[in-house]
Amino acid sequence: MFCTNCGNQMADGTRFCPQCGTQTGAAAAAAPAAPAVYRLYMDAKGLTMLNYKFEVRDAAGNLRYRAATVTESMFTYNARIYYPNDAEALAIHQQKKMTMMAMNFDLVAPNGGLVTQAMQNVKLTKYSYTLPQLGITVDGDFLSLNFVFYRNGQPIGAVRKKVMAWGDSYEVEYTDASLEKVFLGMVMVVQLVIAANRNRRR
């Protein structure tokens, strides 16, 4: 085989040209394929002084989920995510016990099984959560409401709030489709924290 850059002859299977360092076709074939990236778009579709409602669509505009926060009292906050046929996809329940002003939540499957806890790390300028059952951490800031999901120190998803949008709108990007509802659930967690902070100021 020959280097496509300098023409140097090499043994078959050589990954980099010893003459100029150019990557060969063998190296490209051996490199792992980049993971697929999925995107969903979460837009507010009506809200009251207490609760938010959202529609979640894919890039083609297909409705994938509906979501709503449910403020049961001044101190209890929950949310639900539904499929388009109104079947429940995920429930988000605030844990009753508050520690150092942290708001912790349980993400619960339709069969009642715990998917993960969402444990808030109290920080001055960030929304920071740990999802211990999934080995995921979530970091975001108060101002932009953009946040990133990490597993083993590597980013696996991100949520970006649309700045020039009417109401609260988010782009949700991720590489692990099995965690799709978890990412959406964490958007709802942040919405519940926002609602709680708003109620405390009243």
Where are these regions (language model features)?
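Cys/His-rich metal-coordination motifs, chiefly Zn-binding "fingers/knuckles"
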Residues: 1-31
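Low-complexity or membrane-interfacial segments used for flexible interactions
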Residues: 28-78, 84-89, 95-104, 110-202
